[in-house]
A protein has these predicted regions:
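Conserved class I S-adenosyl-L-methionine
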Residues: 1-43, 54-58, 77-81, 85, ...
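Short glycine-dipeptide loop
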Residues: 65, 133-139
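A short acidic, Gly/Pro-enriched loop at the edge of an enzyme's catalytic core
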Residues: 97-110
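A short SAM/SAH-binding and catalytic strip from SAM-dependent methyltransferases
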Residues: 109-122, 145
Length: 267
């Protein structure tokens, strides 16, 4: 499959993320999380670090029209896609450590799916989620486990590091269940429980390898100062060198095992 022209533009990553990753990768996890929370009619839901909003959208589908659902993200690009896909949801730009919730109304449910690991101030973000949650409300936070536990992401990172040097991949940087549990306890949550969950998802191999390489370049020290031409050259080289990973696929698709910690708690 050929990627459209915008695939080389990092500014267009939100469209790529929604088009090729949300459905096969993030929706199954959002559905698992929403099921775990046991939503009930009338629940107000806050999705923190919502990206293009898949957790909020799954919640809205369960609760129906008229439900109070708010999604918050720091990325205007992600929110632009979210608004285009689901205009009925209240999307707000803001950071997790200073949630834009001026109305002060608490939420029955707070979700943070694969966002916590990116927050510069995790205790402040956890405290903000605690304040946003109504007494007795339910929290769900998920973070990928270390990529050392998942063969394909680990191998793709090692390929990229041959060209970029060591990469601190934030996506997998908060995989210790004990750290996650302690963070939530310190923030004042009750009944904290962290479980390891796994899902095998089916992804378009070429697209996944390319998007993963784009993300790794962006997280590398050198990638932050590359010119567009240099970024494209390095991207093409990493994609080329990652080709052996595609040999395990069927019809161009890869079965990718994903592992995540899923923490639940109450306010």
């Amino acid at each position: 499959m050929n990627l459209p022209g915008f695939a080389m533009d990092p500014a267009s990553f939100p469209q790529m993320y929604e088009r090729w990753l949300v459905g096969p990768l993030f929706r199954p996890w959002a559905e698992l999380t929403v099921e775990e929370l046991g939503l009930s009619a009338g629940d107000a839901v806050l999705d923190v670090a919502c990206g293009t909003g898949i957790a909020a959208r799954v919640a809205q589908q369960r609760l129906g029209d008229g439900s109070r659902i708010v999604g918050v993200d720091a990325s205007p690009g992600m929110l632009a896609v979210a608004r285009a896909v689901a205009p009925q949801i209240d999307w707000r730009e803001g950071s997790a450590d200073a949630l834009p919730l001026g109305d002060g109304q608490p939420f029955d449910v707070v979700i943070c799916q694969q966002g916590l690991q990116f927050f510069p101030d995790k205790p402040a973000a956890a405290a903000q989620m605690r304040r946003a949650l109504a007494p007795g409300g339910r929290l769900a936070v998920s973070t990928w486990r270390s990529d050392d536990e998942t063969p394909l992401p680990r191998e793709l990172r090692r390929v990229a590091e041959r060209h970029l040097g060591p990469i601190a991949d934030q996506r997998y940087g908060y995989g210790d269940a004990g750290r996650l549990e302690q963070l939530l306890r310190d923030a004042g949550f009750a009944g904290v429980r962290v479980r390891e969950r796994s899902r095998t998802v089916r992804l378009d191999g070429q697209i996944f390898v390319r998007m993963n390489a784009m993300a790794l370049i962006g997280m590398s020290a050198g990638g932050k100062t590359m010119s567009p031409d240099e970024r494209q050259r390095v991207l093409q080289t990493i994609v080329h060198d990652s080709a052996p990973a595609l040999s395990a696929g069927v019809d161009g698709h890869l079965a990718v095992e994903t592992r995540s910690n899923l923490a639940t708690a109450r306010g």
